[in-house]
Swiss-Prot record:
Database matches in InterPro entries: P-loop_NTPase, Thymidylate_kin-like_dom
Name recorded for this polypeptide: Thymidylate kinase
Domain of life: Viruses
Organism this protein belongs to: African swine fever virus (isolate Warthog/Namibia/Wart80/1980)
PROSITE patterns linked to this entry: THYMIDYLATE_KINASE
Length: 239
């Protein structure tokens, strides 16, 4: 038995952070253990550095930036695994799908090793932000052309996500409707898949959450090849 990893994805400015925090608070009010992790995470050195680049405070090559984001995601493997072992619903406000979509917009291939495939992904679908910023306030990647390219990349990536692990929601829907859809589906996914012990890594290996030692966090010892993991077969995942 373990918790679940929920990803909320989409281009900049479509309400991901709002929905992620609302989901966390609603779950806690219903006595579920829930935590929200934002990427980039401003509370870490790596995340803060990425945000400085995005806010155009410092410069960095595109290749360095995208590789740094993937490294940043991998820094949270032990923390996410521990939370899953403790039966938390872990909500990630952006994750590896964002890393891929944004890197591909710059024609860059990134390493996805040491990252998880989310148990379930909510994709807030929109080609443009709900409220466009003035040019002077735009962060890196927030030009109209770049966001449209990133949106196209997202749609291609999401086409490869198993349909029973993905919910695409028009970002222009009423916020209350979006929240209700996300909350209802998250609870259903959690309640229907409480028997899971493994979580799939992006390289198609598996991490045995139940074998994780919370005292040493040596999660590498819990990695197994993808044989005999019938309990985690995509066709058997219940939503």
């Amino acid at each position: 038995m373990r918790g679940i990893l929920i990803a909320i994805e989409g281009i900049n400015g479509v309400g991901k952070s709002t929905q992620a925090m609302r989901l966390k608070k609603a779950l806690e009010c219903m006595d579920y253990n829930a935590v929200c992790i934002r990427f980039p995470n401003p509370d870490t050195t790596t995340g803060d550095l990425i945000l400085q680049v995005l806010n155009k405070m410092i410069e960095m090559s595109s290749e360095q930036l995208h590789k740094l984001f993937t490294k940043h995601c991998s820094e949270f493997v032990a923390e996410i695994a521990a939370l899953l072992k403790l039966n938390f619903i872990v909500i990630v406000d952006r994750y590896i799908w964002s890393g891929l979509a944004y890197a591909q917009a710059d024609g860059i291939t990134i390493e996805t090793k040491n990252t998880f495939k989310p148990d379930y992904t909510f994709f807030l679908s929109s080609k443009k932000p709900l409220n466009e910023k003035p040019l002077t306030l735009q962060r890196l990647f927030e030009t109209k052309e770049k966001q449209e390219t990133i949106f196209t990349n997202f749609t291609i990536i999401m086409n490869d996500v198993p349909k029973n692990r993905l919910c695409t929601i028009p970002a222009t829907l009423n916020k209350e409707i979006i929240h209700t859809m996300i909350l209802t589906k998250t609870i259903k996914v959690f309640d229907n898949n409480s028997c899971l012990n493994y979580i799939k890594m992006y390289d198609d290996k598996y991490l045995n959450v139940q074998e994780l030692n919370l005292f040493d966090f040596e999660w590498q010892k819990c990695i197994e090849d993808n044989n005999d993991k019938e309990e985690y077969d995509d066709d058997d995942f219940i939503v």
